């Protein structure tokens, strides 16, 4: 009798231990889901959306959002800009010549120096290439100026956005030049910056709105031609823009495309951190830099 009780006690203890071990060693469905989610998050931890400038079918540089590994953004951006890179959208192209190597680079107090191999000289459109490299790297907040060396020899020095992009020269008098960059869209809905050099003594924001209401070859603007900039003011790093009702569409909404066209253009011309959009003096939307 005692032997039977002892055996029964051992059996119950063993069974209990087996059940406990089973619970702790076999994950539940919920635990599997949590683990999988954590792995997915870990996989994209080093990626962030950045903008670079690639070439469209009309040979214009376009602003292109792309995921870039944050471990070495400068090197990765240069790789994306190189011809025959298969990681960019099929409708776009790079422009740094094939086989060009970034030999080294260094960043000192927001001044970036790039040292390329001699293949960089093989570019068929050096102005486009230099604008594209400059604008792409200046999208990084820790870079303000760029110099480009080829085999350790300085070639392009102190580059910034003042060099312009997709430049259009529309002036007749060199002595009264105004330079302003306008952002349009192309047929694939990529934003296309065009730096215009003109004889126009209006304030830059007025030129931006006037140009966005007019047509441009191979480019699109969604700003209604009846839109009027009633008034504007800059205050505490904010640019207030007050429009008439034609800023809005028939549904009383301001489309994202219209907002971005204006905002990108303003941020290239004004050192402000925010744009406040108003319609007939009523605040409707704001955009941060």
Q: What do the PLM-derived regions correspond to, one by one?
A:
Residues 1-289:
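Bimodal "functional hotspot" detector
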